[in-house]
Amino acid sequence: MAIVLGVDPGSLKTGFGLVNHVSGRCEYIASGVIRMKSSDELPERLKTIFESLVEIIECYQPSEFAIEKVFMAKSAGSALKLGQARGAAIVAAVTNGLPVGEYEARKVKQSVVGSGAADKSQVQHMVRTLLHLTATPQEDAADALAIALCHINTQASLIRLAGSRQFRRGRLV
């Protein structure tokens, strides 16, 4: 059993999603969006991200943490803010002893939808379908759940690969 906390970072909205991986099945636990006030200074928003994620970690006790990597942004300032939001989230995870998996947006979409070029509505639809949800999750929450599902799929693939192949000095034999 592994509970994975997926996070879609942002300086104004940070999505989170928790998925339980049991016996090859994925079960929805919870999801939501941490909202910050645009009027707050960036350090205050980063504190909100950190404290909210620590609270979520303490409440749900996930065993693994997955987050989206920084991708191209509209501006250098946006990229820096996104990087700082990621940093606050990652520090919340490592402070609580969680291993961190990082995934590019294209890999997440490929893993969940089957296309790295999928749009937000396709991700929402597949997350709803894969987790048997009765309602469509908000965009940021759906992205976070997709990140958790990508992490689960990636880890399962690595375990299968390690069990079926032999490596010597880091190379496949």
Curated annotation (Swiss-Prot):
GO biological process: DNA recombination; DNA repair
Enzyme superclass (EC): hydrolase
CC per GO annotation: cytoplasm; Holliday junction resolvase complex
EC number from the UniProt entry: 3.1.21.10
Main location as per UniProt: cytoplasm
Keyword Hydrolase: yes
GO molecular function, one term: DNA binding
Residues holding Mg(2+) 1: D8, D140
This protein's UniProt keywords: Cytoplasm, DNA damage, DNA recombination, DNA repair, DNA-binding, Endonuclease, Hydrolase, Magnesium, Metal-binding, Nuclease
Family under the similarity heading: Belongs to the RuvC family.
Function description: The RuvA-RuvB-RuvC complex processes Holliday junction (HJ) DNA during genetic recombination and DNA repair. Endonuclease that resolves HJ intermediates. Cleaves cruciform DNA by making single-stranded nicks across the HJ at symmetrical positions within the homologous arms, yielding a 5'-phosphate and a 3'-hydroxyl group; requires a central core of homology in the junction. The consensus cleavage sequence is 5'-(A/T)TT(C/G)-3'. Cleavage occurs on the 3'-side of the TT dinucleotide at the point of strand exchange.
Name the record gives this protein: Crossover junction endodeoxyribonuclease RuvC
